[in-house]
Amino acid sequence: MSASETPSASASRGLSYRDAGVDIEAGDALVDRIKPFAKRTLREGVLGGIGGFGALFEISKKYQEPVLVSGTDGVGTKLKLAFALNRHDTVGQDLVAMSVNDILVQGAEPLFFLDYFACGKLDVDTAATVIKGIAQGCELAGCALIGGETAEMPSMYPAGEYDLAGFAVGAVEKRKIIDGTTIACGDVVLGLASSGAHSNGYSLVRKIIEVSRPDLNADFHGQRLQDAIMAPTRIYVKPLLALIDKLPVKGMAHITGGGLVENVPRVLPEGVTAVLHQDAWTLPPLFQWLQKAGNVADDEMHRVFNCGIGMIVIVSAADAPAAIAHLKDAGETVYQIGEIRARQPGEAQTIVI
């Protein structure tokens, strides 16, 4: 409907989907833009291409007793910063990382990924940038971007905003599922460095920014502060799958919402406690800034942010040196940050001292 056209005149000529706010041509243009990104993620097992009603994937015959492991997640309020900063190149990797790192914890190899992109009005350039990041995340994880959904829903979202959700499916041999049941006193807790705040705690990050009003373009340890804040979530899949093939990994924990103190207990058996030593690694500059700018207590930091540790790996004391060497050779920064001991009455299952 033109600016001079009345609603009744528009109705008399016949309404279209575009009149309702849905641009089919824009959706088609987006599909054409993202096909090359998805194609680069193809791997063994993918049957067919983008555009079918369902996405097909054949489980490799290398698995004798495959168990499917699935995970779904979003990016949370980190998206609000993406909108404010008009930078959409990192949140796609965030989306993939949140799900593939979760299923990795149980020993699963990520096989394929699907995404959901919802907006009020589709901006092809923005959506293509986001989905390119999703595809790049899939490449890092070794999984195929096998399908997805783009939903343009007028009046559902403010102008310039969108929401993301993702879904990963992986497989693990039934006898190789990592469930934490073999964790015992004397085992060693290794911490793999995070790339930043990943995709958790951003409601607090945004509040700290609101209160402290920093210059997000200011230099921050060799980069802009906004670059440190928006750094994409690290994907640990390939180094850890290789480690699992090399030696017995007893347990892993993806450090997401709830931080170290709430995520590590999720993989521990009854009767043991993980004792983590905060002097075993240096709190990265971003978290030092967040704590100082927001006057955030230590306990709050540990239950909101990853504090520089994005993944926990638990191995026997005998296997710890080999595990550390392997992970370092794979390009990971790894710290020996704690140990497993008997749990005392009334004690939390993870303590930071």
Curated annotation (Swiss-Prot):
<dbReference type="GO" id="GO:0005829">
    <property type="term" value="C:cytosol"/>
</dbReference>
<dbReference type="InterPro" id="IPR004733">
    <property type="entry name" value="PurM_cligase"/>
</dbReference>
<keyword id="KW-0067">ATP-binding</keyword>
<keyword id="KW-0547">Nucleotide-binding</keyword>
<dbReference type="InterPro" id="IPR016188">
    <property type="entry name" value="PurM-like_N"/>
</dbReference>
<dbReference type="InterPro" id="IPR036676">
    <property type="entry name" value="PurM-like_C_sf"/>
</dbReference>
<dbReference type="GO" id="GO:0046084">
    <property type="term" value="P:adenine biosynthetic process"/>
</dbReference>
<keyword id="KW-0963">Cytoplasm</keyword>
<dbReference type="InterPro" id="IPR036921">
    <property type="entry name" value="PurM-like_N_sf"/>
</dbReference>
<dbReference type="GO" id="GO:0004637">
    <property type="term" value="F:phosphoribosylamine-glycine ligase activity"/>
</dbReference>
<keyword id="KW-0658">Purine biosynthesis</keyword>
<dbReference type="GO" id="GO:0005524">
    <property type="term" value="F:ATP binding"/>
</dbReference>
<dbReference type="InterPro" id="IPR010918">
    <property type="entry name" value="PurM-like_C_dom"/>
</dbReference>
<dbReference type="GO" id="GO:0004641">
    <property type="term" value="F:phosphoribosylformylglycinamidine cyclo-ligase activity"/>
</dbReference>
<keyword id="KW-0436">Ligase</keyword>
<dbReference type="Pfam" id="PF02769">
    <property type="entry name" value="AIRS_C"/>
</dbReference>
<comment type="pathway">
    <text>Purine metabolism; IMP biosynthesis via de novo pathway; 5-amino-1-(5-phospho-D-ribosyl)imidazole from N(2)-formyl-N(1)-(5-phospho-D-ribosyl)glycinamide: step 2/2.</text>
</comment>
<dbReference type="GO" id="GO:0006189">
    <property type="term" value="P:'de novo' IMP biosynthetic process"/>
</dbReference>
<protein>
    <recommendedName>
        <fullName>Phosphoribosylformylglycinamidine cyclo-ligase</fullName>
        <ecNumber>6.3.3.1</ecNumber>
    </recommendedName>
</protein>
<comment type="similarity">
    <text>Belongs to the AIR synthase family.</text>
</comment>
<dbReference type="Pfam" id="PF00586">
    <property type="entry name" value="AIRS"/>
</dbReference>
